[in-house]
């Protein structure tokens, strides 16, 4: 970059003064095409002349070009594709406005595996958010909040605890969305989902977020169905300096963050360090939280063409939750007003309470730390080839609280049952009476009837992703790579509190068969008196080993770009159970399966039609995915308690096609696309509420195989900045997501045992003749759980230097309630006819953000603030369909958050 600066300066000074009198001033601002952030250090040359300059730190440039001749402007910068603007005859001064530049796919300075697609070149639907947008919009919300204005994306906070948000994309839930950090997968290896509370600090270190909807173009061997979210962290080539920030918000929200960067030193070293702490009371009653986050990255240029980067990041946290099962009916929420003021009732938490000593108690606390360590080697083999290798290690520690009890009292831990408030242990003020639990256990002559356990989930996960990229010619680029992973997850429950009881007898021990574990042959085995620290319910390891290869060829000829990619992966999975099996029988059979993807697409870029910038593109892509079954709820139907492998487990198949059109100028971008996705042989589980013969409530599930669905829709988004002091961004997404076949489901209780009837009788085995099953007639029925129509429109105004004011409107509608089942639906060889679920009322939200940057004592300082749900709109964000398919029978209803406010001070140094 220094050489470019020197060259450009010499050329500019050498330009004859006499020519300046015969010249015109050309100026503009160069921005990143993906996030509209200004690019400093871009060399701007008037081709055929010696006129050149470079952009300043705000991306601005100004030069004087000779009048009278036709000239082209060339823009070049390390890490970006050279851009040439074909200009007409230069007759006078002109302002080009914003000039976008696209990032190159091979750049030594980018010491991360980005898996980014290039806008308007790669034929996929994508949206990129830069660090500025992330910082402006996140406020006090969870990290996924910033994706709400992305087409096809729906974000819900579920129970409302810290980091408990969930994302769906094009109607596909989190286990079908690939989440990557620097190109490394974050999805759980056993079931595919992501817990965002484990990554709550990513908003502080993210330089960009790119969502690729549909099959995408990410460089991994295992595919996504709904799309991918790739988070790229800040690299070590940041300039020297740092910042300190403090933020505060409603409900005791506080956040401290510091960042320090050395910049690139003369000997090739660079260090970037970030740390932060967040704490608060939580918007929902009794959901206080304490969280920390850290990011450490150090890199070294080993030689001219080699760079080694070590990165470690994590976000340890402790937060109390509101169970996802503890939503009420619509009327139930109105009745809660007897316990909480009118405006507060939607914050109610059915399991928040006190014990006899006046201590605050919870039954849904989550504690977790999932650090990830990455070591990356980037080798620029030549000007046309590079090898990028990342080895990583992830270690997970922690778990979540889970109340347990005898058959008569296990359901007493539930805050609600089928949307109805559980009154068994309810105080007059509506809080849960943990003191009554203590009294019950103290009086019991058979030990504690109700205890608290910690559901521990630990893992050891390591892997390697290596990608070789080669520019075969000016027209052909190829890449190929390997993706290797090894994972072991340990899961058990340990007693943490006897609630004043003398001991506890684990009812799950009665399910241990002597044929599998000889200890169960002892009549006293199931009556053993257990205490704090003892294991109950389950104790097993889930093993997943996966290896894959992937590759892509991209052909670029004039205005046509085409790509063909594929991947092949082999997954081997098994269980090792220490609770239900003795050592000689603890390890299950292993199950291996082969998965693959084939994707292809073309993009055509029409010639410039507006002289200096107007550009039309059209693209089409399609592909096929065959995905191996997940270990839980597919390969092992009773994954917590049994080594028995599902004999009917098959790969899921996905077929998708997509087409789109884009138009962009230096100041205006518009994207329009349509998609059609067929999903076959999906494995799916739904919750189940039953009542046993003794009248005790229980929660289980129905496991379905061979479910088919159709997801299709239209998406549009625009980004317009006509003048430097005003910009507008909007999107619209219309989906049509339906089930396309009738599925067969088998029933299990909360202990993972197959059920024979609606009263809790245990079947003789999985898929045995007496195993209760049911045909679910759902063909043609709308899928629930996500808004099928979303829209947003955001305005940002810069009324004076340093001041920013933003207003965002968001609309959500066509949200159909999800479904679960109850014991009244359960019958051997029965049929359940589904109808169109209840459509939740549409709602609109408005968010306000503002910031002012100024100089304070020589330090760049920013004061910013956010107001979410500015007008305090009441709305339903999540619901399950009831028997009447209406608001009166809908249950597990959650209302969204009311008005949230925050303010932050950030000082750069």
Where would I find each of the regions flagged by the language model?
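Gram-negative outer-membrane beta-barrel transporters
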Residues: 556-559, 676-678, 700-821, 906-908
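Transmembrane beta-barrel wall of Gram-negative outer-membrane proteins
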Residues: 241, 248-279, 284-322, 331, ...
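A beta-strand signature from Gram-negative outer-membrane beta-barrel systems
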Residues: 97-99, 200-245
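Short, acidic, small-residue-rich periplasmic hinge/interaction motif at the N-terminus
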Residues: 31, 35, 42-47, 74-81, ...
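Acidic/polar loop-and-plug regions of large Gram-negative outer-membrane beta-barrel proteins
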Residues: 299, 307-376, 401-454, 517-530, ...
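Surface-exposed extracellular loop regions of Gram-negative outer-membrane beta-barrel proteins
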Residues: 572-579, 590, 604-657, 676-705, ...
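Conserved C-terminal beta-signal and adjacent last beta-strands/turns
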Residues: 6-8, 21, 313, 359-360, ...
